[in-house]
C-alpha cells in the first residue's frame, strides 16, 4: 500500500514543501525567519479579519469604532494590539530575513530574491494604509504627507495625487479606498509568498557556507519543524510580552487624538519601521530627488545579484565584507534614529551623511571590497 502523503494530489504538494523537503544540514537560526514571517502573516490576516468585523471606514466613525473595539468587544483590545504590534514584529522578522539574505548571498537565487523585494514593497504599502485606518492625527497627517510625495512626479503628479485621494484632500473617499486595499493586499501577499516558495524549492535552500550542499541534505521534518517550533514559541513570547506589558511602546501618542485637518502635529513621522526610508527622503532638499531616493533605497535590493563580484557566495569567509556589512547595519540604525528626530541641526547633516554612506556601501564599497578579497585569495 502506497503512502497517502506521497500520492494524494494535494497532500503530495504539502509533503514536498514541508515534510520530505531536502534541506541543508547546517542551516542556522537565521533560516527560521521565513516560517516566522508566514506565522506573522497568518496572525495579521486573522486579527485583521476580526477587526474588520467591527471597524467602520467612515471619517466620522472610524476613530470611535477603534475605541469601541478596545472597550466593548470581547478581547477587542487584545485583537487590536496583536494586529498593531504584530506589524512591528512582522517588520523585525522581515529586516532580519533580508539581512540574512544579504549576508549569506541568498540573492544569487535572483527569482526568489526579486519576488521577495516585491513582497517587501507590498507589505510596506499594506502597513502604510493600515496606519491610516484608526483616523488619528498621525494617521491623517501621515497619509497627507506621504501621498503628497507623488505630486513630485512631473506632469501627472498633481492629478495622480487627487485621483488617489478621491478629492482635493485626504477625506472619506481616501479612508474607504485605503480600507479596501488594506483588506485585499494581504491575500495578494499570501499568493506572492506561494510564488516565493515555488522559486525557492526549484533551487533548494542556501546555507551559511554558501557552498553547494546537495551531498549533505536532511528531511525538513522532523529536524527543522522542531527548530521552527522553537522560533514560533519565542516569537509568540516576545509579541505577547509587548502586547500585555507595553502595547503602546512602538506607537505614536498623537494617534490617540482624532484626526483634525486644521491642526498639524509638531512632528509628522511614520511608524518606526519606515523611519530609515523617511530619513533618506528628508535628507535631500529637492522633492523629486527625495522621492527617488526613497524608492531607490528599497529598490536597490534588486541590484544585489548584479553587484555581487566576489568569487565566494557567502560572507562567512570574508572578514572585510563582514565588517562593511555591520557598518551598513549600524548606518540603518542611525537612519532610523534620525527619521524620528526633528528637522534641525545636527540631525539634518547626520541624516545626509548616513544616506550617502548607505548608497555608497551598497553601490561602491561592498563590490570594491569583493574584488580586493578575490585578489587576496591568490596570495
Curated annotation (Swiss-Prot):
Binding site for heme b b566: 97, 196
PANTHER family per UniProt: CYTOCHROME B
PROSITE patterns xrefs: CYTB_CTER, CYTB_NTER
Cofactor(s) annotated in UniProt: heme b
Top-level taxon of origin: Eukaryota
GO biological process: mitochondrial electron transport, ubiquinol to cytochrome c
Name of this chain's protein: Cytochrome b
Family indicated by similarity: Belongs to the cytochrome b family.
Subcellular location: Mitochondrion inner membrane
Residue ranges crossing the lipid bilayer per the database entry: 33-53, 77-98, 113-133, 178-198, 226-246, 288-308, 320-340, 347-367
Note: Heme 1 (or BL or b562) is low-potential and absorbs at about 562 nm, and heme 2 (or BH or b566) is high-potential and absorbs at about 566 nm.
Membrane topology term: Multi-pass membrane protein
Residues that hold a ubiquinone according to the record: 201
Subunit structure and binding partners: The cytochrome bc1 complex contains 11 subunits: 3 respiratory subunits (MT-CYB, CYC1 and UQCRFS1), 2 core proteins (UQCRC1 and UQCRC2) and 6 low-molecular weight proteins (UQCRH/QCR6, UQCRB/QCR7, UQCRQ/QCR8, UQCR10/QCR9, UQCR11/QCR10 and a cleavage product of UQCRFS1). This cytochrome bc1 complex then forms a dimer.
UniProt keyword list: Electron transport, Heme, Iron, Membrane, Metal-binding, Mitochondrion, Mitochondrion inner membrane, Respiratory chain, Transmembrane, Transmembrane helix, Transport, Ubiquinone
Gene3D superfamilies reported for this sequence: Cytochrome Bc1 Complex, Chain C (1.20.810.10)
One GO MF term: ubiquinol-cytochrome-c reductase activity
GO CC, one annotated term: respiratory chain complex III
Protein residues bound to heme b b562: 83, 182
Function statement: Component of the ubiquinol-cytochrome c reductase complex (complex III or cytochrome b-c1 complex) that is part of the mitochondrial respiratory chain. The b-c1 complex mediates electron transfer from ubiquinol to cytochrome c. Contributes to the generation of a proton gradient across the mitochondrial membrane that is then used for ATP synthesis.
Pfam families documented for this protein: Cytochrom_B_C, Cytochrome_B
Source organism of this protein record: Marmota vancouverensis
Binding note for cofactor: Binds 2 heme b groups non-covalently.
Amino acid at each position: 500500500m502506497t503512502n497517502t502523503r506521497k500520492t494524494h494530489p494535494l497532500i503530495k504538494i504539502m509533503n514536498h514543501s514541508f515534510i520530505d523537503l531536502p534541506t541543508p544540514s547546517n542551516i542556522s537560526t537565521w533560516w527560521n525567519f521565513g516560517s516566522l514571517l508566514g506565522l506573522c502573516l497568518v496572525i495579521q490576516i486573522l486579527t485583521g479579519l476580526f477587526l474588520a468585523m467591527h471597524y467602520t471606514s467612515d471619517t466620522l466613525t472610524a476613530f470611535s469604532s477603534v475605541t469601541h473595539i478596545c472597550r466593548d468587544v470581547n478581547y477587542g483590545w487584545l485583537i487590536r494590539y496583536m494586529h498593531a504590534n504584530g506589524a512591528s514584529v512582522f517588520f523585525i522578522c522581515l529586516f532580519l530575513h533580508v539581512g540574512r539574505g544579504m549576508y549569506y548571498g541568498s540573492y544569487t537565487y535572483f527569482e526568489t530574491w526579486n519576488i521577495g523585494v516585491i513582497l517587501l514593497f507590498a507589505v510596506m504599502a499594506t502597513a502604510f494604509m493600515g496606519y491610516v485606518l484608526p483616523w488619528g492625527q498621525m494617521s491623517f497627517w501621515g497619509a497627507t504627507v506621504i501621498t503628497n510625495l507623488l505630486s513630485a512626479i512631473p506632469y501627472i503628479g498633481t492629478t495622480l495625487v487627487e485621483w488617489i485621494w478621491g478629492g482635493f484632500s485626504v477625506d472619506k473617499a481616501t479612508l474607504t479606498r485605503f480600507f479596501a486595499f488594506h483588506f485585499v493586499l494581504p491575500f495578494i501577499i499570501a499568493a506572492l509568498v506561494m510564488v516565493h516558495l515555488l522559486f525557492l524549492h526549484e533551487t533548494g535552500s542556501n546555507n551559511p557556507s554558501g557552498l553547494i550542499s546537495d551531498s549533505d541534505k536532511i528531511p525538513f521534518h522532523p529536524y527543522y519543524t522542531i527548530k521552527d517550533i522553537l522560533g514560533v514559541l519565542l516569537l509568540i513570547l516576545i509579541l505577547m510580552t509587548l502586547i500585555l506589558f507595553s502595547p503602546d511602546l512602538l506607537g505614536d501618542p498623537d494617534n490617540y487624538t482624532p484626526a483634525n485637518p486644521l491642526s498639524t502635529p509638531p512632528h509628522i513621522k511614520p511608524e518606526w519601521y519606515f523611519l530609515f526610508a523617511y530619513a533618506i527622503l528628508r535628507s535631500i532638499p529637492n522633492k523629486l530627488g527625495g522621492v527617488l531616493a526613497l524608492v531607490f533605497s528599497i529598490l536597490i535590493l534588486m541590484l544585489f545579484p548584479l553587484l555581487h563580484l566576489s568569487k565566494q557566495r557567502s560572507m562567512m569567509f570574508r572578514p572585510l565584507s563582514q565588517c562593511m556589512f555591520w557598518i551598513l547595519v549600524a548606518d540603518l540604525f542611525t537612519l532610523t534614529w534620525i527619521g524620528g528626530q526633528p528637522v534641525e541641526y545636527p540631525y539634518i547633516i547626520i541624516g545626509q551623511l548616513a544616506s550617502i554612506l548607505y548608497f555608497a556601501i551598497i553601490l561602491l564599497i561592498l563590490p570594491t571590497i569583493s574584488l580586493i578579497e578575490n585578489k587576496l585569495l591568490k596570495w
